[in-house]
């Protein structure tokens, strides 16, 4: 199996990310920085390095990537090139907009969709991770937009996670499967 060492390699990558974060910045700022990341309204593009420092931003990226890896592993998703792309996207976008808290309502929404369809979550775990492209919307609604609150943020996240699996299947058909990032198109349609 060509990708059998993918999971250990990604774990090493996450440890490296966290270690570099601790070396480049002050380790005592990591937990307050993570808290600042979590409670920041993520409007448009929010640079976590600017908000909380390099240490907290890299540790956030490591945590989000580890959670993603754990979900893929527990769902028995066979590792492949697309798995690596998903993990790379999760790591990269965890530096701005996506954090260890705001991804959960969307993942839970996709889990509920799988249960409603009476199908294993493993079938939708990739869609779930890519759907977290809209995780900043959860933070925006939950934290500071004038009309939302925590419960509205969770509800919006659940709705996003529930709607994106069938929407992404539809956009895949529109594009004839030619685009690796068909979830980007689906997320864009839903975000509008």
Stretches found by the model and what they are:
Residues 1-192:
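Alpha-helical multipass membrane-protein architecture
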């Amino acid at each position: 199996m060509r990708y059998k060492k993918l999971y250990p390699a990604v774990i090493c990558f996450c440890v490296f990310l966290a270690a570099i974060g601790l070396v480049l910045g002050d380790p005592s700022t990591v937990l307050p920085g993570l808290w600042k990341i979590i409670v920041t309204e993520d409007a448009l593009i929010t640079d976590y390095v600017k908000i909380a420092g390099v240490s907290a931003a890299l540790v956030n990226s490591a945590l989000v990537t580890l959670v993603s890896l754990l979900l893929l592993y527990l769902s028995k998703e066979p590792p492949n090139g697309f798995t690596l792309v998903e993990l790379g996207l999760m790591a990269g976008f965890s530096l701005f907009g996506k954090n260890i808290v705001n991804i959960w309502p969307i993942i839970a929404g996709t889990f509920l969709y799988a249960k409603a369809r009476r199908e294993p979550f493993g079938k939708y775990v990739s869609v779930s991770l890519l759907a977290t492209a809209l995780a900043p919307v959860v933070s925006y609604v939950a934290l500071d937009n004038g009309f939302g609150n925590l419960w509205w943020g969770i509800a919006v996240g659940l709705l996003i996670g529930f709607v994106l699996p069938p929407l992404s299947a539809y956009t895949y058909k529109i594009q004839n499967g030619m685009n690796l990032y068909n979830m980007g198109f689906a997320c864009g349609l839903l975000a509008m």
